[in-house]
Amino acid sequence: MSKFSLLDHELIPHHEIMDEDDLKTVLTHYNVEREQLPKLKVTDPIALEIGAEPGDVVKVIRKSQTAGEALYYRYVIG
């Protein structure tokens, strides 16, 4: 039996760990520090699956009926 991937489920939005260059752009655009972003526990099943570590920022790309895509950012904590 193969392992089920949460990311393959249709109700789970796409998650990706941001690189530092993209992160700086986002933080500057919103005029925030990474610690001010909503939190995501390192023990969250999605964080475990994508290999997120404390201090990372995860970009969540959700489908939106009005905007097409909506971007959310989460700061990974221990």
From Swiss-Prot:
Its EC number is 2.7.7.6. It catalyses: RNA(n) + a ribonucleoside 5'-triphosphate = RNA(n+1) + diphosphate. One of its GO terms (biological process) is transcription by RNA polymerase II. GO terms for molecular function: DNA binding; DNA-directed RNA polymerase activity. InterPro entries: Arch_Rpo5/euc_Rpb5, RNA_pol_subH/Rpb5_C, RPB5-like_sf. It is found in: Cytoplasm. Signal peptide: none annotated. Belongs to the archaeal Rpo5/eukaryotic RPB5 RNA polymerase subunit family. NCBIfam families: PRK09570.1. This is DNA-directed RNA polymerase subunit Rpo5. It comes from Methanococcoides burtonii (strain DSM 6242 / NBRC 107633 / OCM 468 / ACE-M). The lineage of its organism: Archaea, Methanobacteriati, Methanobacteriota, Stenosarchaea group, Methanomicrobia. The gene is rpo5.
